Structure formats: structure tokens, C-alpha cells
Amino acid sequence: MAFFRAYAAIVVRPVLAMYLLYGVAFEAHQQNSSVLFDATGRPRKLLIRDFGDGRSFAPLFQQRGHRIEPFTREGILPTTFDDDISLVRSFVIDACFVCHLHEVALCLDEHYLFAHTTPWHILREEIESAFDALRPRMLSDAFWLDERKAFLEQPWPTRSVLRMHLERYRDYRVEHELPNPVADLA
């Protein structure tokens, strides 16, 4: 479990930092994430590639003194939002937590017997730790509390990919909710 704790921390901390501090969501699923290991096999760094499908919340980015111009082109759905951060949050949860860390946790749970702590307990602890570490740098305590609740207590939104493909991406907001595997584990 020490390995999964280190792995989860390496993935969760930078992904949540970029989202909570700047409103930037990277598509940090397994295909786009490379974890660098040291000589002893411990996870040390996260590299994220494929920035073609990230999302951003312009007001939070601007509050940090930066400016972002939305990329617009006919046939390309927007990736920068001004009025609703939930579209950015759901992107983080879907890519990083549902399609990456939850999959690793499921695999570990299937192949190993855990006496006391499950992978989901560890994932929750690492999410809590990341939120706690970022709290002093947050611009709004209310925002921090709302986001913490969304990641730790509320159902997790995930993209309905098959439906989006069948509908030719006419609506990028096609989502459904999954039970949050880290809720009720505190």
C-alpha cells in the first residue's frame, strides 16, 4: 500500500494544484500520464502530455494575474469557460480520478487482500492531504470548501463517451454520475 500511496500522491497533488489554484484541468488519465520512478522503484514525478483536450476556468486564472484567450474554431467545442467551473471540475474527476486512479485502485483491490486499509482509503487520504496543503494558497475559503466537498463527498461526474461519439460531439456536457468511491470513508 505504500507504493499506491506514493503513486496517488504524485498524481493527485499537481493535478489538484493546477485546478484549485489556476482553474486549469489537464486530461491526466493513464494514457496521458507518465510517472517517473527513482532507482528503487518509488514514484517521484508526474509528466502529463497531450494538452489538446484540457479545460480552464478563466476567472480563476485571471485572479492569479494571468490571462487566457479561449481557442475558438468552427467545429471545436470550447475548452475555456467563464461562468461554470463544474465543467472543468468534472474533467479533472473523470480523467484523473475515474479513468486513472480508480482503475489502479480496482486492479489492486482485485489482486491483493487488504487487512485494514483499502486503496480507496488511501486515495481519500491523499486527496485530503492535497486539499490541506493547498488551503493556505487559496483565494477563497468558500471555494476550497465547495471543491473539497465535490471531490470527497459528492457523486463523481464522468463523461458519457459513447453517447458523445454517437451524437458527434454536439454536446460536450453529456455526463452521468458515479458513486464516489472515497465518500463515507473518513
Please annotate each region the language model reported.
Residues 21, 73, 171-174:
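Intrinsically disordered, low-complexity regions enriched in small/polar residues
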Residues 24-89:
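Catalytic activation segment of kinase domains across protein kinase-like and atypical kinase folds
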Residues 111-186:
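Long, compositionally biased intrinsically disordered regions
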Residues 1-35, 90:
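Conserved kinase catalytic-core segment
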Residues 1-11, 57-62, 70-131, 135:
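ATP-dependent phospho-/nucleotidyl transfer catalytic cores
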Residues 15-18, 35-48, 57-62, 68, ...:
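Generic local-structure boundary detector
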